[in-house]
Amino acid sequence: MRFSTTLATAATALFFTASQVSAIGELAFNLGVKNNDGTCKSTSDYETELQALKSYTSTVKVYAASDCNTLQNLGPAAEAEGFTIFVGVWPTDDSHYAAEKAALQTYLPKIKESTVAGFLVGSEALYRNDLTASQLSDKINDVRSVVADISDSDGKSYSGKQVGTVDSWNVLVAGYNSAVIEASDFVMANAFSYWQGQTMQNASYSFFDDIMQALQVIQSTKGSTDITFWVGETGWPTDGTNFESSYPSVDNAKQFWKEGICSMRAWGVNVIVFEAFDEDWKPNTSGTSDVEKHWGVFTSSDNLKYSLDCDFS
């Protein structure tokens, strides 16, 4: 997408409001759930990864509660390391969704409610046409009802936790999905300049443009600027096949970190980066799929690829 001067002006105004409220946006990371050999991560594996991330964040996001026993194994690790989790709930298919709710009911009582940052029902479910806006709204309301009946290890209720969703910025700005925004306590927007084939010269502009379009629609739909908002996924791969004018490399990932992620946070917008660690277990198939292994800011062996410092002066 080309950068729009009109939208840039609107974005600046919206960002100014955000920056007044929250100063520097928070940083978090999406976290994979499998080891290099494809086995599911244990509590010990998660503890090791969270220790590597601790210098940069205290919040992670996962896509599902039951897959690979994620909540069962990550919950205790996060609690031990002082992290909070955005817990994903996969809303399709029916058997998977039932397993997700069962995982919440079984493992949320074993940790403190302060370990949970919020619940995200679906991840780009609208973008993939997995669910209609009405169907996803119903699932969001259902999960809200489920967690309201669960108490933590100290007997505190999860009823006050926010329940929302995360989806691609472009489907959030589509008017026919407003029911999902209305049903959600909070909404996250994903935006990848890489998958739009942007040059490095335009990547950060495209990122800002996309996110601010989404934020503007979310604020308008909710009728308030006093809402929780995060970039749910963004980043740049460090290896693999180029996509149009977007080239994966460590230098380009570092540049996008500085010009896109750091700048977005400087305007007071919270950002969850995709992703924390490379996922070597992911298979190569065809086209540009080989980049899927290389989105981590850390290698799969926990080595930092480039500086994550931001200059907020």
Curated annotation (Swiss-Prot):
Keywords: Cell wall, Cell wall biogenesis/degradation, Chitin-binding, Glycoprotein, Glycosidase, Hydrolase, Secreted, Signal. It comes from the Eukaryota. The active site is at 124 (proton donor), 233 (nucleophile). GO terms for molecular function: chitin binding; glucan endo-1,3-beta-D-glucosidase activity; glucan exo-1,3-beta-glucosidase activity. Residues 1-23 form the signal peptide. It is found in: Secreted, Cell wall. Its main location: secreted. It is an enzyme of class 3 (hydrolase). GO terms for biological process: carbohydrate metabolic process; cell wall organization; fungal-type cell wall organization. One of its GO terms (cellular component) is fungal-type cell wall. Glycans are attached at residues 202, 284. Its EC number is 3.2.1.58. It catalyses: Successive hydrolysis of beta-D-glucose units from the non-reducing ends of (1->3)-beta-D-glucans, releasing alpha-glucose. This protein strongly binds to glucan and chitin. Present with 45000 molecules/cell in log phase SD medium. Glucanases possibly play a role in cell expansion during growth, in cell-cell fusion during mating, and in spore release during sporulation. This enzyme may be involved in beta-glucan degradation and also function biosynthetically as a transglycosylase. Belongs to the glycosyl hydrolase 17 family. This is Glucan 1,3-beta-glucosidase. The gene is BGL2.
